[in-house]
Structure formats: structure tokens, C-alpha cells
């Protein structure tokens, strides 16, 4: 590009947990010599999933009811994670981390359990988990077609066109509040899904929508039904059913059932 940005598209490769090196060399236009080289080590080939939403997607594994057991088990699965900063800042300043006892506490609890479930069923496929979620946010902030799209521009667009396998979405509590017109969610959720897919340009990748569980918030039943109708209308949208879980806490303390 004129501003110096560039991109390389790699041919499809089979999934592999074999550590590899990516070597990037820059040529000096005056001498013709390759004088600037960057080496990225421990590169693996697998699936990358993006987790979006508000506080329940953002809440870290350290706060889960089964945190100790989950964290001690974190290194047993080939998971890597990337947390987008919650202030809409410079996404590029964030780095990938390897899931382990010393790092897993910072992972999204829902996304950890989702990734662990995938890893257990696809042991030969490395799993990368990107989480971009902000507490107390309405859906209109996550899609320009649904409203302001401010967080979409700040925390989702910079990730494009990062190759994704799919998206997990856990959001809707804010839109069920009494001061909100919850009926808009019937249009906002499918438009968000369509906008993300269109802007990524990778086809109709899967969306896994976490169903709003039992909780004492005004119009939660409307948001829950909007999630269901969106799921029924799109063969590439699936629902993670949670209505059968005990309790009515807006922040369920045990996240494993919400991630599988």
C-alpha cells in the first residue's frame, strides 16, 4: 500500500503442532541487499476462533468456580490466546501467549473452555483464541449496521482480515435492560453476523451464540428469542443452550457449560 502496509497470503497448509520459523526479510532499495530480517519462532498451523461480547465473555478464568483445576490443566492442551485491549487501543501491541499455569488465569473463561473442548476432540490441531469483549456494552457498539459501531471500529476491524475458523458470541444482557428497546435485537444480531462475515471476506464462517441464561433482567426473554430466531434462520449459526443451567446470576460463576 502507499502508506507502507503490506500483506502476504500463504497457501493452505495442513494443521500441525510442529514449531516452525517464519522469516521476513526486507531489501534495501538503494543497495539491493536484504539487511532487515525478522524471525518469528514457534509458529504452528491450526484453527483461530474469535470470542466477542460483554462482561461474561470478558471475565477471566481466574474468577471461575473451577479456576484452580482448569488452570492446572491448561498446559495439557495446545491452546494459545490473544486478548484485545478493552480500551479500543492499539491491537497490534497485544501478543499471543501460550496457555499454561502461569498465563491461563488471564484467558476468557468461556473461551478457555470452548478451546479446551475443541482441543480434546482435535488433538492434532492447535487452537488459537482471540477475545475482544467489553463489560456493559450494547450490541449497537459492535456493528455499524446496528448502531454506532464504535467498538467494532476500534477492536474488531483491526483484526481483519485475520484468518478465522469462526466466532463465539456472548452478549445481550445490556440490551435486555428495561431502558432498552430489546425488540431491536431481532434485527441487530443477524446484521452484526452479516457485517462481520462480509468485512472479513472469508465466507459464512460459523457463529456460536451463547444463549442468555436465566436471570432477573427486564426483557431477557426477548433477547433470548431473538438469538433463537437468528439461529433457526442461518444454518451457520449454532446456539450454546444455557437455559438449563442452575441459578439466575447475571454473571454465572461456573463458565464451563457456557463454552461447550
Task: Describe each PLM feature range.
Residues 1-260:
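Cell-envelope and extracellular/periplasmic
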Amino acid at each position: 500500500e502507499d502508506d507502507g502496509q503490506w500483506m502476504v497470503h500463504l497457501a493452505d497448509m495442513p494443521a500441525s503442532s510442529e514449531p516452525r520459523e517464519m522469516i521476513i526479510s526486507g531489501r534495501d532499495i538503494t543497495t539491493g541487499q536484504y539487511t532487515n530480517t525478522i524471525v518469528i519462532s514457534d509458529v504452528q498451523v491450526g484453527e483461530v476462533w474469535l470470542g466477542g461480547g460483554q462482561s461474561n465473555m470478558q471475565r477471566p478464568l481466574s474468577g471461575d468456580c473451577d479456576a484452580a483445576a482448569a488452570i492446572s490443566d491448561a498446559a495439557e492442551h495446545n491452546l494459545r490466546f490473544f486478548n484485545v485491549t478493552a480500551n479500543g487501543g492499539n491491537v497490534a501491541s497485544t501478543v499471543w501467549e501460550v496457555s499454561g499455569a502461569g498465563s491461563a488465569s488471564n484467558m476468557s473463561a468461556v473461551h478457555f473452555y470452548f478451546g479446551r473442548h475443541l482441543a480434546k476432540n482435535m488433538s492434532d490441531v492447535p487452537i488459537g483464541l482471540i477475545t475482544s469483549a467489553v463489560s456493559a456494552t450494547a450490541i449497537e457498539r459492535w456493528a455499524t449496521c446496528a448502531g454506532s459501531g464504535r467498538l467494532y471500529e476500534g477492536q474488531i476491524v483491526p483484526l481483519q482480515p485475520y484468518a478465522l475458523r469462526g466466532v463465539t458470541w456472548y452478549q445481550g444482557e445490556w440490551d435486555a435492560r428495561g431502558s432498552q428497546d430489546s425488540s431491536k435485537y431481532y434485527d441487530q444480531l443477524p446484521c452484526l453476523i452479516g457485517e462481520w462475515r462480509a468485512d472479513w471476506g472469508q465466507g459464512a464462517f460459523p457463529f456460536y451464540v451463547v444463549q442468555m441464561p436465566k436471570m432477573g433482567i427486564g426483557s431477557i426473554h426477548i433477547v433470548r428469542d431473538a438469538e433463537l430466531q437468528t439461529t433457526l434462520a442461518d444454518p451457520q449459526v449454532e446456539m450454546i443452550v444455557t437455559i438449563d443451567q442452575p441459578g439466575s446470576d447475571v454473571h454465572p460463576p461456573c463458565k464451563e457449560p457456557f463454552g461447550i
